[in-house]
């Protein structure tokens, strides 16, 4: 699907209907070499950086996406560095604000490119 950047994805994009969402921090696909095969396959991707972009905008956009679509599940994947945990926090906040009960899972990637148990 296109676009993938949270800033650019319309909240009512057709590919969001009945989606399993993968919300990824920008650095993850570069740090984790098996990103496409192990994380992205079968999911709709939203990508962004909570440190460099407007986190409040992200929260509002993701809340709208949750409210206005039938999202089946959400996986939030981020790096182990402190700035990346902002993505998980804003996804949790958006989920709470949406009033929806959508299963949320977290994937934490080390700076060496491996999974870290959540």
For each predicted feature, which ranges?
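Iron-sulfur-associated redox domains of electron-transfer enzymes in respiratory
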Residues: 1-118
């Amino acid at each position: 699907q296109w676009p993938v950047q949270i800033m650019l994805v319309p909240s009512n994009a057709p590919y969001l209907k009945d989606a399993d969402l993968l919300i990824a921090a920008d650095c993850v696909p570069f740090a984790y070499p098996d990103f496409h095969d192990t994380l992205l396959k079968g999911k709709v991707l939203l990508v962004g950086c909570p440190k460099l972009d407007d986190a409040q905008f992200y929260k509002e956009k993701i809340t709208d996406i949750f409210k206005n679509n039938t999202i089946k599940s959400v996986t939030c994947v981020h790096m182990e560095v402190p700035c990346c945990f902002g993505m998980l926090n804003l996804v949790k906040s958006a989920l709470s604000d949406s009033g929806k009960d959508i299963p949320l899972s977290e994937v934490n990637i080390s700076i060496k490119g491996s999974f870290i148990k959540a």
